[in-house]
Curated annotation (Swiss-Prot):
Interacts with the 40S ribosomal subunit. It comes from Aspergillus niger (strain ATCC MYA-4892 / CBS 513.88 / FGSC A1513). This is Translation machinery-associated protein 22. It is found in: Cytoplasm. The SUI1 domain may be involved in RNA binding. One of its GO terms (biological process) is formation of translation preinitiation complex.
Length: 197
């Protein structure tokens, strides 16, 4: 018996989904986030065709026609409330970033040995583990991310590299961290007082 060649079914392709550059949701769901206006502006610039299908006068009128008058009022109130909440959260984050400092401490371990401890990078949205690894490669020394007693993350780099770390941070992450928010601190161990005989 001869086998009949059966057509191979075409492999189904995954659908290409566009994600918003502001809130990372699909544009159809941006209205449920707090950054609807920014999302709308991003969509207008990045994908004008999709913007027309979602935010054109016809699309908005057809969506509003299905709602009752009271539902329209509630939707408008909810949208205004969400926008105000998002604006307040954004202002709070900006204020917190402006007030926070990245501290680079030079800590003495023994007589001649020092470590450099960096704190405050997580406020700027930077990954401490990645930065610790990059610092270890850059300065060819041991570098690790640890949690301090206060529960904050800190990066410990072996050696006295505090000035170099500041320069490197400004070079690599200068857009995120302003120079005025980086402070160098020298932390010396207190010498034990000897008792008088």
């Amino acid at each position: 018996m001869a086998e009949v060649a059966q057509p191979v079914p075409a492999e189904s392709q995954a659908k290409h989904v566009v994600y918003c550059g502001v809130c990372t949701l699909p544009p159809e769901y941006c209205e449920f986030g707090g950054t609807a206006k920014k999302c709308e502006e991003w969509l207008k610039d990045a994908h004008p065709d999709m913007y027309q299908s979602l935010y054109s006068e016809e699309a908005l009128n057809s969506n509003l026609a299905t709602l009752s008058v009271s539902a329209r009022e509630r939707a408008a109130k909810d949208a205004a409330k969400k926008e105000a909440k998002a604006a307040a959260a954004e202002a709070r984050d900006a204020e917190r970033k402006a007030a926070s400092k990245v501290q680079i401490k030079r800590v003495e371990r023994n007589k001649r040995k020092h470590v450099t401890v960096i704190t405050g990078l997580d406020i700027y949205g930077l990954e401490n583990k990645k930065i610790a690894k990059d610092l270890g490669k850059k300065f060819a020394t041991g570098s690790s991310m640890t949690r301090s007693a206060g529960g904050t993350e800190e990066i410990t780099v072996q050696g006295d590299v505090s000035d170099d770390v500041k320069e490197w941070l400004l070079e690599v992450y200068g857009k995120e961290i302003p120079e005025a928010n980086i402070e160098l601190i020298e932390d010396k161990k207190k010498k034990k007082a000897t008792e008088a005989p």
